[in-house]
Amino acid sequence: MDENLLVAKLPQYTKSILNALNAAGYEAYVVGGAVRDLLLGREPGDYDITTNARPEQVLALCQAKSWHTVDQLGQNFGCVMIVLDGIATEVTTFRGERYDESDAHRPAATWYCDSLREDLSRRDFTVNAMALDIHGQVFDYHGGKADLARHLIRPVGKAAIRYQEDALRMLRACRFVAQLGFDYVQDGLPGPACGMAGTPYYLKSVPRFPVERCRGLSLERVRTELEKLLLGEFAGKGLMLMLATGLLQQTCRVRQDGVYIEVPLLPEAQHLLGLAQNPRFHIYDTWEHTLLAIDSSPRELAIRWALVLHDLGKGLSNVRIIKPDGQPSDPGHEAQSAKMAEAILQRLRYGEDFSRLVVWLVAQHMRFAPMLLTGEKTLRRWLRHEAANGPFRTQAQLVAGYKLLTEVFLADMGATHARENQQLMAEGRALGEQVVAMAQESMPIASQDLAVKGRELLELVPQNEIKNTFAYLINRVQSGNLPNEHDALLAALNKKLARKKGGHYERT
């Protein structure tokens, strides 16, 4: 990319900081992921700056310019946070780092250094180890631009050293694969292949990771990386790398009551690799079907997690059967998968609302397909059952849940032979839209979902009857024979009261 074009893409607040540091006699560069994204033609999420100015010198410069800085906690690591144009920018002094076995992520010692080359040498991957100055010159000492051109994620230096230093880098490698769609390469002897040759997720050579180092990582950091991976455009590719290298089978840790507790990541997924499915319906084994479904879905965390977990019950001894034609089948696997999903999300410390939603998506993901052959009455019964028993407190939550479930269903179906049948996929989409519309129009759950308010009902019934009255109206609307409209609801209630009292109540 043209040097002038790179600089032109920098936001003004970033240029102001670079120019101010340069004018004061210091080196200053945009560094890391922002440079990578600019070279790829992507919009960076943020713009980190590195400089040979020490934190106190950066602070003095900010004070002279009346620039706001955030609290100075970051100075312990040579970092000053400058807030300009309402946006925070990390300005970090060139530094070196030393790691030891005492911590799986944080360096044992840091020090300031005077060289950009030394600062870039401590970074994780070549595509993240580049710097850009205000004139548009890219400083690339480790072949980052070449790896970008070849779509490669490669550690800076020797992979074994990089991962022994900071175990989180192994998860970051998988995350960048998921976000960028690049292949991962490293030094050393090639490992064995993994997956089905000819599929999008086949790995010709699995890299060797010191995965046992993950045990010292905090659950919070691991979950953050895993979520970023799941939301990547190529999440399936990143997950395949995690499983093939053994990362998914590892544990991290969480501190509870003063002691560390081991938390498994996702070892339950291992048995899906190579697990055969009925070729009448399926293209791939269960794991690669899962990956394709994930990549076929919208990048929303609840959807992605539901698809990761939706087939975990397949192949288990209490689920799998072999049919008379010799083909495998997994009847009821969705219930087993939902049970496993609940345990997994709980141990990964997800909140109750999120967990219940994902578990519901997993449990319900097989319900849509039979509905293609049924009528409106069956759809309504299903909706009413889930309105009463699902993880929803309001109609809006129910509608949102069915929108998510539609996407889970379509992604799951689209990872089978059905993906080749455009008419069937269109019918599936239409069914989802029909169910969502029905939920929006006639499936209130709470009193607040009705078009009448409690104060209006108090003019018609005693206060101790309000709850039952709301329940009556909700039931009528859900049954489909009463629209959720203000006048219609009051008319229906008046009619009911007239039958009960032998007279008709008129509001005054």
Locate predicted features.
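Catalytic cores of the polymerase beta-like nucleotidyltransferase superfamily
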Residues: 1-508
